[in-house]
Amino acid sequence: MPKFYCDYCDTYLTHDSPSVRKTHCSGRKHKENVRDYYQKWMEEQAQSLIDKTTTAFQQGRIPPNLFSAPPLGGPMIPPPHPSMMGPPPPGMMPVGPPPGMRMPMGGHMPMMPGPPMMRPLPHPMMVPTRPVMPRPDR
């Protein structure tokens, strides 16, 4: 009879049946081994990302600080007007008024309605019913 091998636990089960696998997979040691396996995998992925970022930085492909302020005394360039930037990328909602529409006096955008709020479903209630009476034969 074929045996079932558990990669997480590095062990063979007594035999390959659904009940044996279910019992094994619901056990404390198996769950710990699965958790440890994925924890180790996540740490390896994080370390790989750190190494790639460090290598790219050392090769000069990443600037020293992406979010640095402009140098003191340097020119302050205002952000472009929203209508000058062109359409938003696909899947993004446009920000600001449509092209050709001016802002209202005071410079504030009117509040745009958001998606409708979902109300919580009412709790099911017991509906009183009359007892069913047997009908007399007609």
UniProtKB/Swiss-Prot annotation:
Tell me, what is one Gene Ontology molecular-function annotation carried by this entry? pre-mRNA 5'-splice site binding
Keyword Nucleus part of the UniProt annotation: yes
Where are the zinc-finger regions (Matrin-type) in this chain? 4-36
Name the InterPro entries on file: Matrin/U1-C_Znf_C2H2, Matrin/U1-like-C_Znf_C2H2, U1-CZ_Znf_C2H2, U1_snRNP-C, Znf_C2H2_sf
**One Pfam family cited in the UniProt record for this chain:** zf-U1
Show the Gene3D superfamilies listed in the entry: Classic Zinc Finger
Share what the entry says about its subunit structure, partners included.
Component of the U1 snRNP. The U1 snRNP is composed of the U1 snRNA and the 7 core Sm proteins SNRPB, SNRPD1, SNRPD2, SNRPD3, SNRPE, SNRPF and SNRPG that assemble in a heptameric protein ring on the Sm site of the small nuclear RNA to form the core snRNP, and at least 3 U1 snRNP-specific proteins SNRNP70/U1-70K, SNRPA/U1-A and SNRPC/U1-C. SNRPC/U1-C interacts with U1 snRNA and the 5' splice-site region of the pre-mRNA. Interacts (via N-terminus) with TIA1 (via C-terminus); thereby promoting spliceosomal U1 snRNP recruitment to 5' splice sites.
**Which HAMAP family does this one have?**
U1_C (MF_03153)
- Supply the name of the protein: U1 small nuclear ribonucleoprotein C
Which organism's genome codes for this protein? Monodelphis domestica (Gray short-tailed opossum)
